[in-house]
């Protein structure tokens, strides 16, 4: 499923570049740490999102806070800590919507991503902010709308 990408903002928190080897190394170390600590970070349950790079075509894995949405679906927020730009994984999903996987509690599955808009987004946003108030702070840091994606188990082709 494809979606229209939310544009970048003009202001926001500074975000590290994922393009350099050091940042990718730190990302891999963080994933190992999170796995050992029960897939949690700062009080948030995590999932591991795997996408295919929009430019490189290589698989990329990113730990993200997960919010249950029923029927085995999860919500994730493309916040990048309130950066002016959308995270790389968001662009990867837009470029390769049929190549998205998650790992939750040791179970891996292929998913479809749906960007929420309008009332469904607002309802989801309120649930997310009630659960993790830090996301309201991320939104205040930037003038872009933080995309919320629903990741649902993919139907077999």
Cite the ranges covered by each PLM segment.
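Short, active-site-adjacent segments that bind or coordinate small-molecule cofactors and metal centers
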Residues: 135-157
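Alpha-helical membrane-targeting segments
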Residues: 2-45, 140
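Short, structured beta-strand-loop surface elements
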Residues: 80-134, 141-145
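A broad, low-specificity signal marking well-ordered, structured residues that form hydrophobic/aromatic
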Residues: 47, 74, 100, 111, ...
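A generic structural micro-feature
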Residues: 41, 56-58, 94, 143
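Short strand-connecting beta-turns/loops that link adjacent beta-strands
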Residues: 69-72, 107, 156
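A generic structural motif
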Residues: 50-54, 103, 152
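Short beta-strand segments
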Residues: 44-79
